[in-house]
Amino acid sequence: MRKIELLVPASSLEVLKIAVIFGADAVYIGGEAFGLRAKAKNFSHEDMKEGIAFAHEHGVKVYVTVNILAHNYDLPGVREYLTELKELKPDALIIADPGVFQIAKEVCPEIERHVSTQANNTNYATYLFWYGLGAKRVGSARELSIAEIKEIREHIPDDLEIETFIHGAMCISYSGRCLLSNYFTGRDANQGACTHPCRWKYSIVEETRPNEYMPVYENERGTYIFNSKDLCMIEHIPDLFDAGIDSFKIEGRMKTALYVATVARTYRKAIDDYKKSPELYQQNMPWYLDQISNCTYRQFTTGFFYGKPSDEAQIYDNNTYLKEYTYLGIVGGTNEEGLYRIEQRNKFSVGEQIEVMKPDGENIEVTVKRIVDEEGNDMESAPHPKQVLYIDLGHPLEMYDILRRKE
């Protein structure tokens, strides 16, 4: 059985630490440039340095995305950025552009180069091409089936790794190379500034009636013809193992700590259970399915893994997320009184019942006994986002425990 890596996203230093604690084998992050997530918090040089050190202390790898499709004017900055990354010693760079790949090979040859799914890697000849250029890993295009990935594995060297997205948002465009955002808003998805027009509501115009906008109804709110369901392969871990995939990748470099912790913890347990015993994996399936629905998500699909998706892979009647839990904060130490420090994310009150989410899979229901602000004043509720508070939940807590509330 191949050693499987669980690769988890992180939008910030805080989320990286959560990903590490909640079960990631590797974390992928973006810096302040060239990482295709302009809206994400992303990592400063200092945050990246601290994050890589933290991950390495816990035996976890860090990969940095440099997957921009570069123009001529980007190239001097790319070279300078890669020179900076060389000092930080990430475990790999994730790259889509052949020119950027070549520059990385020249500037920091000692850092592994992984080829991004953005490079449209749909066949074993492409994998062999990248292998010949020095790639250690190639990310499979989202449009590939399990059977196609298995065939690729049969035609490539054992030391060339396959990375595949197994959970998260799906892009309407071929491997995410979308032009809709650029066309409608002038913001280029391939430069990290996607405005997600695939989630908008659309009307149609008949050619001879250019000023008449006609709605297309799925329900009273209109239709969302490009709006994909989210990918979820938690029920198909055996097939992913059998396909010869080396890295199971979670989408979500814009997601919250609660989302990352929930998905990482669930897939960590599913992978470990299956490695111990296929029967144990099947026995715990209700737990996986329950947990994976405890963070904000859309309806689920298996994408292209079992052939071309049917119309059931799309959400036509709305563009909303499903939400089971609200994220309240992360435990970040204690004060002199033994109260636990958190930075509040959503309102909660004294007397309210909430839940502590622990990395080992345990969820503990507790009642908020006390809330104190930084000046030592008692509060009945915590209404201000990102306010630093000290709380008593009547139960011992640990660093990086996550607090959430069932809705």
Regions found by a protein language model. Name each.
Residues 1-10, 15-21, 26-33, 51-52, ...:
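Surface-exposed amphipathic alpha-helical tracts and adjacent flexible/coil segments at the periphery
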Residues 37-54:
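Glycine-rich, positively charged N-terminal anion/phosphate-binding segment
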Residues 99-100:
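Alpha-helix capping/helix-boundary segments
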Residues 39, 117-121, 140, 224:
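Alpha-helix capping and helix-loop boundary segments enriched in small/acidic/polar residues
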Residues 76, 113-124:
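Gly/Gly-Pro- and Ser/Thr-rich, intrinsically disordered tail segments characteristic of DNA damage-repair
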Residues 108:
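Conserved phosphotransfer cores of two-component systems
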Residues 64-65, 95, 115-117:
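Short beta-strand elements of ligand-binding domains
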